[in-house]
A protein has these predicted regions:
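Contiguous mid-protein beta-loop-alpha structural module that forms a pocket-lining wall or clamp
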Residues: 1-47
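Short acidic-glycine-tyrosine-enriched beta hairpin
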Residues: 2-13, 27, 119-139
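A generic structural signal for well-ordered coil/turn residues at beta-strand boundaries
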Residues: 8, 16, 25, 81-86, ...
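Ligand-binding loop in jelly-roll beta-barrel domains
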Residues: 17-37, 124, 128, 137-161
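Short peripheral tails and domain-boundary helices/loops at the edges of structured domains
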Residues: 35-53, 151-170
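C-terminal amphipathic alpha-helical segment
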Residues: 37-105
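Extended hydrophobic-aromatic, low-complexity segments
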Residues: 88, 98-101, 117-119, 125-126, ...
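Glycine- and acidic-residue-biased ligand/ion/polar-headgroup-sensing regions
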Residues: 92-121, 129-130
Length: 170
């Protein structure tokens, strides 16, 4: 069992099959590979169904879970790239023009501030801290317009072949 001390802004990568929990008082954005399965091994007395047998069978002991080691030569906005998703974090003071590939929608989450997502042929969508907007592949281009300073995370599928990120226990 490993305990990872976290601070605001830390990026933790948890590989599938890693038993993990989120400590009290934490607020997080959880991005995961596409899956319809969650095995609950403990539920803090909430009374939801547990999945002990299936959960134990799915555990991987060779987990690469830990704090993501940021690559110094890469994109400064990129928090993590994995074979299943990528996560970027940006502080916006000016509008951001973005395009969506045919392979991946974008999920834009406001971490601080508020903004509007605009695209030709659709109504503008306002969003603020803690809210997310899914930009589907049918929208080829969009603009994120901050109403004041806006900090966002943007999730999408990675492009090209991507290895597991480097991590460290902290």
């Amino acid at each position: 069992m490993n305990w990872i001390n976290v601070n605001a802004g830390d990026m933790i990568y948890v590989t599938a099959g890693t038993v993990h929990t989120i400590g009290g008082g934490m607020i997080l954005v959880e991005t995961q590979q596409s899956s319809d399965i969650t095995y609950r091994l403990y539920d803090y007395g909430r009374g939801r169904e547990l999945h002990i047998k299936d959960g134990i069978a799915a555990i991987k002991l060779d987990s690469k879970a830990g704090k993501v080691v940021r690559e110094s030569d890469g994109d400064p906005n990129m928090l993590v790239r994995s074979p299943f998703f990528q996560v970027e974090k940006m502080k916006l003071r000016e509008p951001l023009q973005a395009s969506v590939s045919r392979e991946s929608p974008h999920i834009v989450v406001a971490i601080e501030g508020a903004g509007i997502i605009e695209s030709a042929g659709m109504e503008p969508i306002s969003f603020a801290k803690g809210e997310a907007v899914v930009v589907p592949v049918s929208v080829p281009a969009y603009t994120v317009r901050p109403q004041w300073e806006l900090e966002v995370m943007r999730m999408s599928l990675p492009t090209g072949d991507v290895a597991e990120p480097r991590t460290m226990l902290g």
